[in-house]
Amino acid sequence: MSKPLCSTGLRWLWLVVVVLIIDLGSKYLILQNFALGDTVSLFSSLNLHYARNYGAAFSFLADSGGWQRWFFAGIAIGICVILMVMMYRSKATQKLNNIAYALIIGGALGNLFDRLWHGFVVDMIDFYVGDWHFATFNLADSAICIGAALIVLEGFLPKKQA
């Protein structure tokens, strides 16, 4: 017997749409207003810097000849499907897990769109301290990391009694 979607974690799919709009919108603005490698200082320790990532996190496998584009696209699709099944199986009231899953799905879809449309992921956030720069990243990456952190956090919280 099927259950109403609004009673499942899929009720939180609106957050996927919000993440996608913000992520793709920020990437569109970078692509329209920056040349590759351009940098604009926002404030101390934070720049906007247009970079292309042909690999995964920290440009992992970026120089692998192109096959990695499809490999990482497949991983993103698989993760999105698995997390949507998990959202369907969970209750809408399990907010922390469902928010985490929605953030990860939204981020994964944002980067998947880049891979399929451009052949690379658009990165633009350059955080640094002194001369040390963290890897350039984007809002989709941030959503994925926040979602993963929420899943870890949920594991440490006491379970509610049924």
From Swiss-Prot:
Membrane topology: Multi-pass membrane protein
Name the record gives this protein: Lipoprotein signal peptidase
Enzyme Commission code: 3.4.23.36
Active-site residue numbers: D123, D141
A GO MF label: aspartic-type endopeptidase activity
Key words, A-Z: Aspartyl protease, Cell inner membrane, Cell membrane, Hydrolase, Membrane, Protease, Transmembrane, Transmembrane helix
One annotated Gene Ontology cellular component of this protein: plasma membrane
Major place of residence: membrane
Biological pathway: Protein modification; lipoprotein biosynthesis (signal peptide cleavage)
Record's catalysed reaction(s): Release of signal peptides from bacterial membrane prolipoproteins. Hydrolyzes -Xaa-Yaa-Zaa-|-(S,diacylglyceryl)Cys-, in which Xaa is hydrophobic (preferably Leu), and Yaa (Ala or Ser) and Zaa (Gly or Ala) have small, neutral side chains
Compartment(s) where it occurs, according to its Swiss-Prot or TrEMBL record: Cell inner membrane
Function summary: This protein specifically catalyzes the removal of signal peptides from prolipoproteins.
InterPro entries: Peptidase_A8
Swiss-Prot/TrEMBL GO biological process terms: proteolysis
Membrane spanning stretches: 12-32, 70-90, 102-122, 137-157
Pfam families membership: Peptidase_A8 (PF01252)
Enzyme's top EC category: hydrolase
HAMAP family on file: LspA (MF_00161)
Organism: Citrobacter koseri (strain ATCC BAA-895 / CDC 4225-83 / SGSC4696)
UniProt similarity note: Belongs to the peptidase A8 family.
Domain of life: Bacteria
Any coiled-coil regions, as ranges: none
